[in-house]
Design a protein with these regions (language model features):
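Hydrophobic alpha-helical transmembrane segments
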Residues: 567-572
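Cytoplasmic C-terminal tails of single-pass
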Residues: 644-648
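Hydrophobic alpha-helical membrane segments
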Residues: 456-458, 590-601
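Extended, compositionally biased regions that are outside compact catalytic cores
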Residues: 1-121, 128-524, 528, 534-565, ...
């Protein structure tokens, strides 16, 4: 030890104060000889010093000689080769090769008790080879090499039932991750998939996935206290490692999607290798196909974590649609129109395979999530149809005409009626077994959860269409109740009633469907019907009496106001007569409320308008109709009173 310290101290002091490049040859020879002497000394010391360990008798190791020689020697060597290209990297590689060869030579004599020294030399050899990588390559390639080396070390530890190589492999994975993300930037390359960003990310992702695959089941170890502690940590790693590797795999494709092409001329800006649409679909396709491959892996190995990415197909497609909207594109633009059906088909396949994967891969929480994905998929399809219709209206330049709103309401009506007809066939649980997937297990997700928000939107859309549309749908002439505006609104009301009847007939009835039997539903339908019939008269006044289509002109029009008074009274009369004959007291009261509204309008609106003759006509017409109502439709008795009367 005294010679070791003295030699190092003298060599270091001389190198610091007196060394110059012309001394390289003699200094290099001295350093090689010095290292060889003390390596031999460490081997001779181990040979001469037996030591009893847990696995038997081995030779002791002088840690100062074994570890001090290469560490201090490499420090001096790095100073000697500093002027040379990659001198430190080649020196580290030489140190690593030397110690690996020594370990291999001593391994044949492990039966003689050199096992401890072999492990020390192996650790030094692997360490120097690992160190050579960052000294020679940039950070992205360094991280890739470290990740591969870490996977190799983990595999060796798995085969040898030793925890230390496995721990070393995990540490290298962590270092690779830090090195890669610490220098991450937008790649510049003329070659697709052949640049450090993509290749580096792939070479980090694949080792992480391999380690996750090996560690998914408990691995053997020596049983020592340290090994048991490491085993508890290792048992927590497979799922996070898999997710980390899968995300890195997607990161590789993300780096490819943002790749820049080198500028053809100096000082000119670089251009994107992929258009925005192409980059979006590259990422979407890579994500869905990778998820499908992971699902196949999960089905083959029965590893539940590998199936997780395949259950996120719907969020991926939603993000793709949002990204498409963000750049102002539609589903009908470019190659998006064939890509969307393929992506939806793959998403459907993923749903089907997941739901039939077995209880060991699909727990109840994931099952509920997949059930809601059916609802979300229906909403996504509605959004895609709406986007395509928007593109069509834009292409036909129909904005500003009634056609735009008519197309929207008619399309929503068709979707609601289609889902009612298709999914409503399986509205009885007892009969679902004869239907194919997905109706046999998810019919309610389509005919109730998916359609209920659409029904509300359709009601609002029909209300807005009836309220705002002038009915001008050139080149078609305006015919009351037979024009596109009125027909679209009436069909919407019919579809809502059809859907309500199907839901009410369901067994068991969906949760929350009781609202469709409450007065609030009929109140909403009645309000929509009143608005529809009232605005029909507005459009008649506009088209046949030349009343301008604006709020001021319509409000101050004698034709509109008198027509409203008579129309609402007739509607109230019809409602009250029908309610009287059927004994529907709430409906009769609704008609009476409408009559009260007519009277209020006569007082507040008609009396304030000019023209005594106009007011007289309105009052006489309404008064006569009220007399008819009082004669033909008196208030029905309450339900209890009617029952007592019938019993008597």
């Amino acid at each position: 030890l005294l010679g070791f310290v003295a030699t190092f101290g003298t060599a270091g002091a001389w190198g610091w104060m007196r060394y110059s490049p012309e001394h390289y040859a003699s200094a290099q020879a001295f350093l090689i000889g010095f290292i060889a002497i003390f390596i031999a000394a460490s081997i001779l010391y181990a040979r001469a010093t037996p030591l009893r360990l847990g696995w038997g008798v081995s030779h002791a190791v002088d840690h100062t000689l074994v570890f001090g020689t290469p560490l201090l020697g490499f420090g001096l060597q790095a100073g000697l080769v500093q002027p040379f290209w990659h001198g430190a990297a080649f020196s580290a590689l030489g140190f690593g090769a030397t110690y690996l060869l020594l370990a291999a030579a001593l391994l044949r004599r492990a039966a003689d008790g050199y096992r401890l020294l072999v492990e020390c030399f192996l650790a030094l050899g692997v360490g120097f080879v690992t160190l050579a990588v960052p000294l020679a390559l940039d950070a992205q390639w360094t991280s890739a090499i470290w990740a591969l080396e870490g996977a190799a070390a983990f595999w060796v530890g798995t085969r040898q039932a030793r925890w230390m190589p496995r721990a070393f492999g995990l540490v290298l994975q962590l270092l690779a991750c830090l090195s890669f993300f610490g220098t991450l930037g937008q790649p510049v390359s003329a070659w697709p998939l052949a640049h450090p960003g993509f290749v580096g990310a792939v070479l980090i992702a694949l080792p992480a996935l391999a380690i996750a695959h090996w560690a998914r089941r408990p691995l053997p170890h020596s049983g020592s206290r340290w090994a048991l502690g490491y085993a508890r940590l290792e048992a927590l790693l497979p799922t996070p490692l898999f997710l980390y590797g899968f995300i890195l795999w997607l990161q590789a494709w993300s780096l490819e999607s943002v790749r820049l092409l080198p500028a053809p001329v100096v000082d000119q800006p670089m251009t994107a290798a992929w258009s925005s649409t192409a980059a979006q679909w590259l990422m979407t396709s890579a994500t869905l196909l990778s998820a499908a491959a992971a699902l196949q892996w999960a089905l083959r190995t029965r590893w539940a974590a590998a199936a997780w990415p395949s259950r996120l197909g719907l969020p991926v497609l939603v993000l793709a649609l949002i990204a498409q909207w963000g750049v102002g594109h539609h589903v009908t633009d470019g190659f998006a129109w064939p890509a969307w059906p393929l992506a939806l088909a793959l998403h459907g396949w993923l749903l089907h395979r997941n739901e039939h994967a077995g209880a060991d891969l699909l727990n109840p929480g994931w099952a509920r999530w997949l059930d809601w994905q059916h609802t979300g998929t229906a909403w996504l399809l509605m959004a895609l149809v709406g986007d395509a219709l928007t593109a069509g209206v834009d292409h036909a330049r129909l904005w500003g005409t009634a056609w735009a709103s008519v197309i929207g309401v008619a399309s929503a009506t068709a979707v609601l009626a289609g889902l009612t007809r298709w999914a409503g066939r399986a509205n009885r649980a007892s009969a679902r077994g004869r239907f194919a997937w997905p109706l046999n297990t998810h019919a309610e997700a389509y005919y109730w959860r998916a359609v209920a928000p659409l029904a509300l939107l359709l009601w609002l859309g029909a209300f807005a269409l009836a309220w705002t549309s002038s009915g001008r749908t050139e080149p078609l002439p305006y015919i009351p109740l037979l024009n596109p505006t009125d027909l679209a609104v009436l069909l919407a009301m019919g579809a809502l009633l059809l859907w309500r009847g199907m839901v009410n007939a369901a067994e068991p009835r969906p949760q929350g469907a009781g609202l469709l039997r409450q007065p609030v539903f009929w109140g909403a339908i009645g309000l929509l019907a009143l608005v529809v019939l009232s605005t029909v008269w507005l459009r008649v006044a506009h088209h046949f009496f030349q009343v301008p289509w604006n709020a001021w002109a319509l409000y101050h029009s004698f034709v509109v106001q008198t027509g409203y008074a008579i129309l609402w009274t007739v509607l109230a009369l019809a409602l009250m007569v029908a309610a009287h004959r059927r004994g529907l007291r709430p409906a009769w009261l609704a008609g009476a409320g409408l009559l009260a509204l007519v009277v209020l309008k006569l007082i507040l609106v008609d009396l304030s308008n000019r023209g005594g003759g106009e007011r007289i006509i309105a009052f006489i017409g309404v008064g006569v109709l009220m007399l008819v109502v009082g004669y033909l439709a008196p208030l029905p008795p309450r339900a209890a009173a009617r029952i007592d009367k019938e019993a008597a």
